[in-house]
């Protein structure tokens, strides 16, 4: 009898396997009637010390000259992407149709999926923050290192950079961002979890800032921001935010739901900030400023005069 009571007590003390797998965000636990694990209760890797997201103190990030420009392959190709409501976010399936290299990455990486995090408030929808400032949204483009590119056996067995995530902060602007319109318009077709649809034809490049804004970014090693929180991500957080019209941003929380009953609006799908610990954040070096347009015109005559004086 004592043994039976002991086993019952032990099973009651442990969450069930289904409960452990049913993770959620704080807003879901506050709004719904079903039990789920909020971020502070996520277990396993989520309790380790190299987690994401983090606050980036921009003045403490050290310049690394090896962090050069990125090269985007397939990003400019127009596609009819599949987009789905996965119960935690909206996700575009990229299916290895694009890749990245450069940017200080150790190898080429294949694009797997794109998803976003957001709020209905302009100051709490991003996962990462810059100098303590959060933004309205954050877009993650998730890539996986091409197979067979690990430098040694140990790295292949336990890679810390198997996944490369490009993180773009998003703020509210006054103009409609036409590049995001196909995605925003598709949201009406996927209000419930497990629903999917096809977007109007667009390219990944349509979602990105101008090329010059992609030169300034921060880099650190961290984790996935959702369970299983694997610590195998090389993060790139771009300094310059993307701008969307306020109505475009609000469409995500107005049209998407966490539950099939459509009672809990999908918003605040954000993991709290994690400690940086002993890790180092590095940043790309600012490129030199181009010469003012009039200066080259002046340099020609000046050099001619100097040369003439030298030849006398």
From Swiss-Prot:
Which residues act catalytically here?
88
Q: Provide the leader sequence positions.
A: 1-18
Cysteines joined through disulfide linkages: 24-36, 46-229
| Cofactor annotation | Zn(2+)
The protein's topology relative to the membrane is: Lipid-anchor; GPI-anchor
Which terms does the UniProt entry file under GO BP? bicarbonate transport
Which keywords fit this entry according to its UniProt record? Cell membrane, Disease variant, Disulfide bond, Glycoprotein, GPI-anchor, Lipoprotein, Lyase, Membrane, Metal-binding, Retinitis pigmentosa, Signal, Zinc
Answer whether the UniProt record assigns the keyword Glycoprotein to this protein.
yes
The positions annotated for binding substrate are 225-226
* Annotated disease: Retinitis pigmentosa 17: A retinal dystrophy belonging to the group of pigmentary retinopathies. Retinitis pigmentosa is characterized by retinal pigment deposits visible on fundus examination and primary loss of rod photoreceptor cells followed by secondary loss of cone photoreceptors. Patients typically have night vision blindness and loss of midperipheral visual field. As their condition progresses, they lose their far peripheral visual field and eventually central vision as well.
Family as reported in the entry's similarity comment? Belongs to the alpha-carbonic anhydrase family.
Q: What is this protein called?
A: Carbonic anhydrase 4
């Amino acid at each position: 009898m004592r043994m039976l009571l002991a086993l019952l007590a032990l099973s009651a003390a442990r969450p069930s396997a289904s409960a452990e797998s049913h993770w959620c965000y704080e807003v879901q636990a506050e709004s719904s009637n079903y039990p789920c694990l909020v971020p502070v209760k996520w277990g396993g890797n989520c309790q380790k010390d190299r987690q994401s997201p983090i606050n980036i103190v921009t003045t403490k990030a050290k310049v690394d000259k090896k962090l050069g420009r990125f090269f985007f392959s397939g990003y400019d190709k127009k596609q009819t992407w599949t987009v789905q409501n996965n119960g935690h976010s909206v996700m575009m399936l990229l299916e290895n149709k694009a890749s990245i290299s450069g940017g200080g990455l150790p190898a080429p990486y294949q694009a797997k999926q794109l998803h976003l995090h957001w709020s209905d408030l302009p100051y709490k929808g991003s996962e990462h923050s810059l100098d303590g400032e959060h933004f309205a949204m954050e877009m993650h483009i998730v890539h996986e290192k091409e197979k067979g590119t690990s430098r040694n056996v140990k790295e292949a067995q336990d890679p810390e950079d198997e996944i490369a995530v490009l993180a773009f902060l998003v703020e509210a602007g006054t103009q409609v961002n036409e590049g995001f319109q196909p995605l925003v318009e598709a949201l009406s077709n996927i209000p419930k979890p497990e629903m999917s649809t096809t977007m109007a034809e667009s390219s990944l490049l349509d979602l990105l800032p101008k090329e010059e804004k992609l030169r300034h970014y921060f880099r650190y090693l961290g984790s996935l921001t959702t369970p299983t929180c694997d610590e195998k991500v090389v993060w790139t957080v771009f300094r310059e935010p993307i701008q969307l019209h306020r109505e475009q941003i609000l469409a995500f929380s107005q049209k998407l739901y966490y539950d099939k009953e459509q009672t809990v609006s999908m918003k605040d799908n954000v993991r709290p900030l994690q400690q940086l610990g002993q890790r180092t954040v590095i940043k790309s070096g600012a490129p030199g400023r181009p010469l003012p347009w009039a200066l080259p015109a002046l340099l020609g005559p000046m050099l001619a005069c100097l040369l003439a004086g030298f030849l006398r």
